[in-house]
Amino acid sequence: MTNFGRLRVHIAPVGFQFRRVTEPLVKMLADKVYLVTYRENDDARKFVDQVRKELQKYPHVEEQTIYLNLWDLYECLEKFRQIVFNEKQNHVFVNVSTGTKITSIAGMLSCMLWKATPYYAPVAYPKTNEAQPPPTEIVEDPEVLPVYDINKPKRESLQVLDILNKAGGRMRKAQLISELERAGVIRLKDESIVKFTKAAKHSQLRVILDPMELEWNYVKVESNGRRSEVSLTEQGITALRIFGTP
């Protein structure tokens, strides 16, 4: 635990080098770890068991196992986001040196998006003339990696995506305005104005939708006479999966 009462929580995908999971937990004084693996009984099971056996030496480290598709970027991002949000009162670290390449990518993206700390555990291999891996890897001190901010969609943009998704991916503008009014996104901002006109509501909606359509390609706006509809694009669906509901 840190001086400020925050737990040191680790997300650690389990690969075939179990010490790259356990050594950083010990050296970085972990309080809790989420072990990420594919299935309960797959080829990596024995390595998960090795990690658990090693952690028995450190009973203060709480362990929780998470099962997910390690080759699905979006599933990994969704789960990592959920963990970071659930542990937002703590300091979350992500091991990007273990698991699959996809979990490493998801780990780095998660850290940049949701302010966790990534680290890499290098392995020192002894010099040998034989082309075979050593029986036991020597894990050096983990290296904390730099992270940079990623521009995330605004909250109201995510609300629009969520509303459209729940409506089946398409909605008339008038219906969307009603939903956004209900959510408090479209509202009368000047109390000196007595009447909140239809034109004013459409103007506020346009401010939200224009960048979503023209810059991000999250939605498509189609007009047919006086009837206008807003539909969710594949890019918008992907954004909702990555960034989550507001």
Regions found by a protein language model. Name each.
Residues 1-91, 105-246:
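Long, low-complexity, Lys/Arg-enriched
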Residues 90-98:
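Short N-terminal targeting/anchoring amphipathic segment
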